[in-house]
Curated annotation (Swiss-Prot):
The system is composed of three essential subunits: KdpA, KdpB and KdpC. GO terms for molecular function: P-type potassium transmembrane transporter activity; potassium ion binding. It is a multi-pass membrane protein. This is Potassium-transporting ATPase potassium-binding subunit. The chain crosses the membrane at residues 5-25, 63-83, 132-152, 170-190, 253-273, 283-303, 329-349, 356-376, 379-399, 416-436, 484-504, 526-546. It comes from Escherichia coli O45:K1 (strain S88 / ExPEC). The gene is kdpA. Belongs to the KdpA family. Keywords: Cell inner membrane, Cell membrane, Ion transport, Membrane, Potassium, Potassium transport, Transmembrane, Transmembrane helix, Transport.
Amino acid sequence: MAAQGFLLIATFLLVFMVLARPLGSGLARLINDIPLPGTTGVERVLFSALGVSDREMNWKQYLSAILGLNILGLAVLFFMLLGQHYLPLNPQQLPGLSWDLALNTAVSFVTNTNWQSYSGETTLSYFSQMAGLTVQNFLSAASGIAVIFALIRAFTRQSMNTLGNAWVDLLRITLWVLTPVALLIALFFIQQGALQNFLPYQAVTTIEGAQQLLPMGPVASQEAIKMLGTNGGGFFNANSSHPFENPTALTNFVQMLAIFLIPTALCFAFGEVAGDRRQGRMLLWAMSVIFVICVGVVMWAEVQGNPHLLALGADSSINMEGKESRFGVLVSSLFAVVTTAASCGAVIAMHDSFTALGGMVPMWLMQIGEVVFGGVGSGLYGMMLFVLLAVFIAGLMIGRTPEYLGKKIDVREMKLTALAILVTPTLVLMGAALAMMTDAGRSAMLNPGPHGFSEVLYAVSSAANNNGSAFAGLSANSPFWNCLLALCMFVGRFGVIIPVMAIAGSLVSKKSQPASSGTLPTHGPLFVGLLIGTVLLVGALTFIPALALGPVAEYLS
């Protein structure tokens, strides 16, 4: 089984790296404000029709555009969900959502989290799924990519005060990156057997003679952008373990590839725009090392079996509880690490049923800030924060002013970096503490002891870091949990974007200094090790006490 696991990991890494390289070149053109071939005329007509000016923006204007679009989208989606019973494409006559669930869901999809306190097939109409959630899957992904576009320009431009035009970037990302790739993936899913229709739910008779109601809907179109945009919210409650969403082993492999495609391509694009492709490869090496180690740990833990079942005399040589038999332990373990490393949150297995160590790794990947590939855009700008921190630490050790790509990293940048890095740990630890101190928080726990605490910690970690997956043993559809997690999702998303954009505004005005004999190389194995160490150190110092009360205590008990 070890050989099978190694082959699976190696094949996955090879395929997504090969696919991401050409996409990275296309993204580099967009970052450099060079239209893709054959798109100039279409863009000119669209910009004119929409009244979009291509005048460049400073960081405050760029940030205002991103925030304005997302807040408007939140309001529209909130009222759409409240009044879905008045809207078309609702063959099951599903009622509108309660205010707290509508708020939680709207914030969830606008922030690219896709936390779901509901079952899609029994709660949302086709219109809400298609015009509400799927639209936000595109816009939230485009927003994250636009932010990293601005940050990359800040590192590569000299003595300027503008970072591009947010509206131009959003349109280009949506039209020329997300839409065509998502369309190809959706067509492939349909060919493989995923649903794509507007039929009412179908009553069928099973082979045992019982009646069953099969849900229908425009699934494939939402599934494609759900994975490509690292959104993760399922059309059905079972998410990607549902055969109508993920019908074959081939679609499952493509879903994993789609999750990592854009985050990897952005690393290639960064190196190309920076004029030193080694910089992008350095980031990919750091991410890949952490990723492979985490996959190996989860596979090992799940192959060992469930010790509690073994103690009861059951045959549990491997831990198949909560896993699809058509995917198995190894693929389920790989998918769990992919979806939590990349802030996607889609699942093909119940993470709540993983072993203590097997469930701790996905939780920890979220807690370090979703920087191991991470979400589209958000993963790379999150990792760039750790790059700046690593450069600062190295500068302290060698007694030089820290710099990255020739730009001095001053006190202002480091204060903003520290602020951005501390946002999500603060939300996770304070949110979990609040939940454990209140009756409303504890009443949602379906399990006692360390595992019950792990469910709470996982939920808040998932929300604050915009992942969206869950340990499902938590009854989170209550006003307390819907509001708490909505707050964590909103602040966890925009509380990081704001300082990142401020860092971009500060760096873009600086002039790059030529490298000297005392300049720390940021493209070699030494810096890769320093970056990995920085990520691990911050994660360990912040979350080891909380993890010790949850999965570690469960493992030792």
